[in-house]
């Protein structure tokens, strides 16, 4: 009987933890994402949709801008997860590659810019703690992480371009390379 009671308590505790997690999302990440979305759309309305579309069209002409500069700026300005939403301004064919690059930027830039991905800063701080224990400055680690990330995140987007083309060929589909006006 004790085993059944123990199992029942554990089972109910699972839902208690799930409820607490849900409440933390409702009071934490969900309002933040909602307000960031409102903020981003307000900036777009203030700047003008046509100017944002022109910048996206300009960025989509060059893979370095599309998978290097735009994801970095989006991660820096909007943080995770809103940086991923900037891909909506690119042509359909570039969206998978932008997502690959931008999602990596939300990780590799957090050593120097912790506001990008606050939820992951404990990983960097754990590594930086080891560097500090050795008597070294963790800033150099953060800069190296950022610089390597700039290069590797660009390549992640670029390689995803090639894999997207392979998948399109396999599936017999064609994603548009033209920017649609929003």
Curated annotation (Swiss-Prot):
Instruction: State what protein this is by name.
Output: PTS system glucitol/sorbitol-specific EIIC component
Q: What is the stated purpose of this protein?
A: The phosphoenolpyruvate-dependent sugar phosphotransferase system (PTS), a major carbohydrate active transport system, catalyzes the phosphorylation of incoming sugar substrates concomitant with their translocation across the cell membrane. The enzyme II complex composed of SrlA, SrlB and SrlE is involved in glucitol/sorbitol transport.
Q: Does the keyword Transmembrane helix belong to this entry?
A: yes
* Any single biological process term in GO: phosphoenolpyruvate-dependent sugar phosphotransferase system
Q: Which residues cross the membrane?
A: 28-48, 63-83, 139-159
Keywords attached to this Swiss-Prot or TrEMBL record, sorted alphabetically, are: Cell membrane, Membrane, Phosphotransferase system, Sugar transport, Transmembrane, Transmembrane helix, Transport
Q: Which organism is it from?
A: Clostridium beijerinckii (strain ATCC 51743 / NCIMB 8052) (Clostridium acetobutylicum)
GO CC terms on record?
A: plasma membrane
Known InterPro entries for this protein? Answer: PTS_IID_sorb
Membrane-topology descriptor: Multi-pass membrane protein
Entry's localization field: Cell membrane
Where it mainly occurs, coarsely classed, is membrane
Indicate whether Transmembrane helix appears among the record's keywords.
Answer: yes
Q: Where is the PTS EIIC type-5 domain?
A: 1-182
User: Per the entry, what induces it?
Assistant: Activated by sorbitol and repressed by glucose.
According to its record, what is known about the domains?
A: The EIIC domain forms the PTS system translocation channel and contains the specific substrate-binding site.
């Amino acid at each position: 009987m004790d085993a059944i009671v123990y199992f029942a308590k554990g089972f109910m505790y699972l839902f208690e933890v799930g409820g607490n997690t849900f409440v933390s999302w409702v009071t934490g990440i969900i309002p933040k994402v909602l307000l960031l979305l409102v903020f981003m759309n307000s900036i777009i309305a203030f700047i003008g949709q046509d100017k944002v579309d022109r910048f996206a069209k300009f960025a989509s002409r060059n893979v370095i801008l599309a998978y290097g500069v735009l994801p970095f700026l989006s991660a820096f300005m909007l943080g995770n997860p809103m940086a991923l939403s900037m891909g909506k301004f690119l042509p359909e064919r570039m969206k998978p590659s932008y997502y690959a690059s931008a999602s990596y930027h939300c990780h590799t830039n957090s050593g120097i810019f912790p506001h990008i991905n606050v939820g992951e800063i404990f990983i960097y701080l754990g590594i930086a703690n080891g560097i500090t224990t050795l008597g070294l400055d963790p800033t150099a680690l953060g800069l190296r992480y950022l610089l390597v990330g700039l290069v590797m995140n660009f390549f992640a987007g670029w390689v995803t371009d090639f894999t997207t083309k392979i998948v399109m060929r396999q599936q017999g589909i064609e994603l548009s390379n033209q920017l649609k006006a929003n």
